[in-house]
């Protein structure tokens, strides 16, 4: 899949080129890129309607029936949604967008970044799209920041409070007043790694879906995208480079924080030590990276949770009750496994995802506005949704899990 980039950006023109063959329309893996001239008259007319107090859904309806190019209309609509949602800190999954915006608006707005993260736009439905489905939120934000005039005016000149307080974005869906949106008083950061393509081990097809769903679940649980570091198909060197970048992020916080580290991929148990296998076959010992994390945290009351969706099988398989000393003697740190010692973590061929991660994500997404008594209970609920009376997960650690409010 070829990558696109902004070739030049000015006040009057936006040009996006394809790195491989410079075609406007490549293949079904790419979206249509319209390199038409940006029409300032269109933007200024829309801006005037907003500043005159017109409801945003009427303005969007105006743009949809205008004679301006499809790309410009969708870009502006996407920017509206992006700026408004960012102003009230609503980051979440596809279902969160349905709740606040409505599916009809989402489907019609190709430039809406979070929608594009999770849902692929196919060849027949891609006319006018400006960002490929594979771009993550940070890449989308970088692109939007290049639209200097549009972005600056929307963020500085429009009254976002009046837009957010009950003004409809579509005929039947309304944004909640910003005062009713619960914002977390706790800083939450996360490190996500998913290894799928191995040089010496079986490929894990469901890992990418696991990572994407877990990432979106965190966004819906008051994790800001700027505080999430994620890594796909990493060798040993790349992992440590990213890990120490993450530790620098952790060290930048003086106050209480909650840290979630998620891993999906191959793993093995060696003399009681769980090792995460990188794509080049080299292992990373979980207890070692846990120690580096706890040493980097400056507030002793902070919580650390490792969620590991991998096999714990190996030549030296230990019974389930065997403690992991490096975790057991640490305050406020725990590790949640998808399976017990000597067991395998399974993928669903039908769902193309890990069974544990899918169930876990579904459960915390549904319960994100409620207090969770214990991670163990939560995981039991998740697993039993698929396998009756199955309780293969395990939690090792000694902190009060009720402190974690997803």
Swiss-Prot record:
What's its EC?
Answer: 3.4.22.-
List the Pfam families: Peptidase_C14 (PF00656)
Q: Which UniProt keywords apply?
A: Hydrolase, Protease
Supply the enzyme class, top level: hydrolase
The region called Caspase-like is annotated at 193-374
Look up keyword Protease and say if it applies. Answer: yes
Phenotype upon gene inactivation:
No change in morphology and persistence of induced-cell death.
| One Gene Ontology biological process | contractile vacuole organization
- Gene3D superfamilies assigned to the protein according to its UniProt record, in alphabetical order: 3.40.50.1460
Q: Name one GO molecular function term.
A: cysteine-type endopeptidase activity
**Active site per database record:** 266, 311
State any GO CC term.
Answer: contractile vacuolar membrane
Identify its protein family: Belongs to the peptidase C14B family.
Role this protein plays = Not required for DIF-induced autophagic cell death and necrotic cell death.
Under which name does UniProt file this protein?
Paracaspase
Q: What is the organism lineage in this UniProt record? A: Eukaryota, Amoebozoa, Evosea, Eumycetozoa, Dictyostelia
């Amino acid at each position: 899949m070829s990558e696109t980039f902004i070739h030049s950006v000015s006040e009057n023109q936006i040009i996006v080129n394809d790195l491989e063959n410079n075609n406007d329309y490549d293949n079904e893996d790419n979206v249509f890129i319209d390199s038409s001239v940006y029409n300032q008259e269109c933007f200024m007319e829309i801006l005037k309607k907003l500043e005159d107090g017109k409801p945003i859904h009427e303005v969007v309806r105006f743009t949809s029936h205008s004679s301006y190019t499809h790309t410009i209309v969708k870009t502006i609509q996407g920017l509206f949604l992006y700026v408004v949602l960012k102003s009230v800190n609503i980051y979440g999954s596809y279902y969160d967008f349905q709740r606040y915006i409505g599916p009809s608006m989402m489907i019609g707005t190709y430039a809406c970044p979070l929608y594009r993260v999770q849902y692929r736009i196919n060849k027949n439905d891609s006319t006018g799209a400006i960002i490929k489905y594979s771009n993550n939120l940070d890449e989308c934000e970088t692109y939007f920041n290049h639209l200097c005039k549009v972005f600056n005016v929307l963020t500085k000149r429009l009254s976002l409070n009046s837009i957010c307080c009950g003004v409809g974005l579509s005929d039947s869906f309304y944004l909640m007043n910003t005062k009713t949106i619960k914002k977390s008083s706790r800083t939450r950061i996360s490190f996500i790694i998913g290894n799928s393509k191995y040089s010496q081990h079986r490929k894990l097809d469901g890992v990418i879906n696991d990572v994407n769903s877990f990432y979106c679940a965190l966004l819906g649980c008051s994790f800001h995208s700027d505080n999430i570091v994620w890594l796909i198909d990493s060798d040993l060197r790349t992992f440590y480079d990213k890990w120490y970048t993450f530790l620098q992020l952790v060290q930048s916080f003086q106050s209480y924080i909650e840290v979630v580290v998620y891993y999906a991929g191959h793993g093995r148990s060696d003399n009681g030590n769980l090792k995460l296998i990188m794509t080049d076959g080299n292992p990373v010992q979980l207890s070692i990276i846990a120690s580096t994390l706890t040493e980097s945290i400056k507030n002793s009351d902070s919580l650390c949770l490792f969620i590991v969706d991998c096999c714990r099988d190996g030549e030296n398989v230990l019974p389930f009750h065997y403690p992991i000393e490096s975790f057991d003697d640490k305050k406020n740190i725990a590790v949640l496994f998808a399976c017990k010692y000597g067991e395998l973590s399974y993928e669903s061929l039908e769902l193309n995802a890990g069974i544990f991660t899918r169930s876990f994500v579904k459960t915390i997404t549904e319960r994100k506005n409620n207090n969770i008594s214990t991670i163990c209970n939560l995981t039991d609920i998740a697993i039993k949704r698929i396998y009756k009376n199955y309780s293969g997960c395990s939690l090792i650690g000694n902190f009060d899990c009720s402190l974690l409010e997803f």
